[in-house]
C-alpha cells in the first residue's frame, strides 16, 4: 500500500521519535497500522513527541493518510484522531485525505462497481492517486471572497453564536452570509438511489427541495469557505446541522469540494468540544472532501447564556482565529 503509492517519489521515512527533522512546510503522508486496541501506538508516540517539541511543529505543512487495520474496525476513527492532533500543530489536509484498508479490504467493494479490478489492486490504485493529489496540491491564497456560516442556535441564548460574532467582527475583507437552520426545516437524507441523487444534483436540487435547495446548497456552492457553528449537544453535532451535512450529497455528486475550506466554532457546557470537532473532520474533510485549513476550529467552554464573554482571553483568541480564517482560505 505504502510502497505502491510512493514509488519513484523522493521521500524521507520518519520512524525515530528521538531524531525528528523539521516538519514545517512539508508534504506529509501519515501511515498507520491500526492494531487490536484501535490505535497505532508508535504513531501516537511520534505525534506526542512533536507536540512536546513545539505545538507549531507542522505549520505550513499539508497532509494525507494511509491507514491499514488488522480487522474491519478502527481506521476511520483513528484517522480523525490523527487529523485532529496534526491540525492543532498547524497541518492542513487536502479534501478526501484518507485511503483506508480494512483487514478484509471489503471497504473497497463498492469501488469494484466502477473499477473492474481485484480489491488489493484498487487499494494500490487509490493510494497512488491520493499521494499524487497531495504532491501537486498548491492552492492559492484568497484575500477576498465569500464565507457562509451555518448554525441552528437561537440568537438570544447561544454562546456559540456570540463567540462567532467576536470572531467575525474582525473579518472585513470577506462577504459573510449567515444562515440559520430552523428546527425541522431540513429533513434528513432518505438515501435516494445513486442515479436519482445524481439527477437532482445536476439540476442543483434535491428530492426534498425546500431551504436546502433554495438557500443552503446555492450558498455553499458560491462560497470559498463554510463556518460551522456547533454547540456541543451530547458530544455530537446538532441534529439540524447533521441533516445539512447528510443532504450535501446532492451537491457533492455534481462537483467536489476540494477548493472550499471549512472552519468550526465549537462551544461546550462542560467538555467534549474535541469530539464535535473530530466529527466535523470525519464528515466534511474525510468523507465529503472539503479542505481542512490549519487550526480549523476555535473551542471554548461556556454553559449559561453570555458566559462566553467571561472566558479568559476570549477577545484575543477570537481575533487570532479571525486571522486563521482570513489567512487560510485557499483555492
Which sequence ranges carry the predicted segments?
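FMN-binding flavodoxin-like domain, especially the glycine-rich phosphate-binding loop
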Residues: 1-175, 217-222, 228-230, 235-331
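Hydrophobic pocket-lining residues within nucleotide cofactor-binding pockets
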Residues: 181-184, 232
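Cysteine-cluster motifs in flexible loop/terminal segments that predominantly coordinate metals
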Residues: 184-217
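The conserved SAM/SAH-binding core of class I Rossmann-like methyltransferase domains
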Residues: 150, 179-182
Amino acid at each position: 500500500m505504502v510502497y505502491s503509492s510512493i514509488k519513484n517519489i523522493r521521500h524521507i521515512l520518519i520512524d525515530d521519535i528521538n531524531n525528528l527533522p523539521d516538519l514545517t512546510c512539508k508534504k506529509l503522508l501519515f501511515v498507520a497500522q491500526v492494531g487490536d486496541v484501535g490505535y497505532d501506538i508508535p504513531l501516537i508516540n511520534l505525534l506526542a513527541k512533536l507536540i512536546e517539541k513545539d505545538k507549531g511543529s507542522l505549520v505550513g505543512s499539508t497532509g494525507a493518510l494511509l491507514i491499514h487495520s488488522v480487522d474491519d474496525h478502527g481506521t476511520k476513527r483513528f484517522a480523525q484522531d490523527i487529523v485532529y492532533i496534526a491540525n492543532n500543530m498547524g497541518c492542513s489536509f487536502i479534501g478526501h485525505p484518507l485511503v483506508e484498508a480494512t483487514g478484509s479490504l471489503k471497504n473497497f467493494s463498492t469501488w469494484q462497481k466502477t473499477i473492474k479490478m481485484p480489491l488489493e489492486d484498487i487499494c494500490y490504485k487509490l493510494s497512488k492517486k491520493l499521494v499524487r493529489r497531495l504532491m501537486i496540491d498548491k492552492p492559492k491564497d484568497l484575500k477576498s471572497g465569500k464565507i457562509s456560516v451555518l448554525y441552528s442556535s437561537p440568537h438570544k441564548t447561544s454562546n456559540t453564536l456570540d463567540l462567532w460574532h467576536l470572531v467575525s467582527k474582525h473579518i472585513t475583507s470577506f462577504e459573510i452570509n449567515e444562515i440559520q437552520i430552523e428546527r425541522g426545516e431540513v429533513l434528513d437524507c432518505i438515501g435516494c438511489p445513486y442515479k436519482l441523487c445524481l439527477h437532482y444534483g445536476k439540476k442543483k436540487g434535491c428530492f426534498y427541495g425546500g431551504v436546502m435547495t433554495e438557500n443552503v446548497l446555492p450558498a455553499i456552492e458560491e462560497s470559498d469557505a463554510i463556518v460551522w457553528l456547533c454547540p456541543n449537544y451530547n458530544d455530537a453535532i446538532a441534529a439540524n446541522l447533521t441533516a445539512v451535512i447528510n443532504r450535501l450529497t446532492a451537491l457533492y455528486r455534481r462537483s467536489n469540494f476540494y477548493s472550499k475550506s471549512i472552519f468550526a466554532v465549537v462551544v461546550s457546557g462542560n467538555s467534549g468540544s474535541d469530539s464535535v470537532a473530530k466529527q466535523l473532520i470525519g464528515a466534511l474533510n474525510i468523507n465529503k472532501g472539503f479542505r481542512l485549513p490549519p487550526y480549523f476550529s476555535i473551542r471554548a467552554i461556556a454553559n449559561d447564556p453570555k458566559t462566553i464573554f467571561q472566558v479568559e482571553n476570549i477577545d484575543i483568541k477570537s481575533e487570532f482565529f479571525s486571522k486563521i480564517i482570513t489567512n487560510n482560505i485557499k483555492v
